[in-house]
A protein has these predicted regions:
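Basic, Lys/Arg-enriched alpha-helical interface segments
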Residues: 1-101, 110-114, 121-147
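Hydrophobic/aromatic beta-strand elements that line small-molecule binding cavities or substrate pockets
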Residues: 104-105
Length: 147
């Protein structure tokens, strides 16, 4: 399972991020406690998928994908991989190359899916308020039915 997930997430073409958000019900049957899906805007954009595609390093994408996979299979999971931020929003914490740190903010929806709301490279110790507010806004939109 790991090899298939990794190849579809990173593969040779970083624009083919299809390992997340495809057939979540089938993935739950394969042992995932909370299959990850991308939050989708009204316009059809997927902010986390777009952010991942824009990362310059395939090693960064691989590390983030591994940590998301760890949460999918190990939920509920705590530090150092995952931390609650309040209001039902959590962060996946990933150490990247060149001593950088990324965060992918998510929540668990009523269907038991890990909805990836927002991703960013951390530049300060504290999670920036604007990033947390954006994730909360995306969560509200998703809960209102904007998938």
């Amino acid at each position: 399972m790991y090899r298939i997930w990794y190849i579809t997430l990173v593969g040779k073409n970083p624009k083919s991020l299809t390992g997340i958000g495809t057939q979540p019900e089938a993935l739950q049957r394969q042992g995932k406690h909370v299959p990850a899906i991308f939050f989708r805007t009204e316009a059809g954009g997927e902010p986390v998928r777009d952010w991942l595609r824009g990362l310059p390093s395939s090693e960064d994408r691989k590390r983030i994908g591994e940590d998301i996979k760890t949460v999918e299979f190990g939920w509920p999971i705590g530090m150092p991989v995952c931390r609650p931020l309040g209001d039902g929003v959590y962060e996946v914490r990933t150490s990247l190359v060149q001593n950088r740190i990324s965060r992918v903010l998510f929540y668990i929806d009523k269907k038991g899916r890990m909805v990836l709301l927002h991703g960013f490279i951390k530049k300060t110790q504290k999670t920036p308020d604007e990033d947390l507010e954006l994730a909360r806004s995306n969560k509200s939109k998703h809960q209102r039915g904007l998938k």
